[in-house]
Amino acid sequence: MQAVHDEFANELAFILVNDDIGHNAGLMINPGMFREIFPHRMKRLIAPAKAKNKLVAYHTDGKMDKIFPILDDVGFDIVHPIEPESNDIFAVKEKWGERFALVGNIPTVLLAYGSIDEIDERVKLYCEKMGPGGGYVLGSSTSIMEGIPPQNFVAMTRAAHKYGRYGSLGKA
């Protein structure tokens, strides 16, 4: 990590650690074991970025409630993607919104099968509820995959521009 950071630090806005450890019902590792092993190793991994005051994001799919305190202790700044099938992003924002920037949560099922109006309404809701106080980056709950109609992705993006401006909600 140090070599990568030394080479690219000035060009990067943040560092993303992609480490899927969860599924819809919980962690794929015993929480006690996770707490014992993860913090020390992750602190060492992200130390070069933190030394240069870079933001560090953590990505994992699945239910995250048990790991937020650990992510906080390690020093992560951003959490991605807060899957809606496993996490109530509004409750996460209430509890952890002062500590982390939150990314994602627009269901890929909605993007795959929803109407443009349904997508627009969901984005509006998220911008209204997640926007106050900042710290939210609208995005999908996982990767934009094959099978998501391009027009639905465009609808999400347009709605984000329409509703997602801090301080000017709905005034594009």
Short names for language-model regions:
Residues M1-A172:
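Active-site loop segments of alpha/beta catalytic cores
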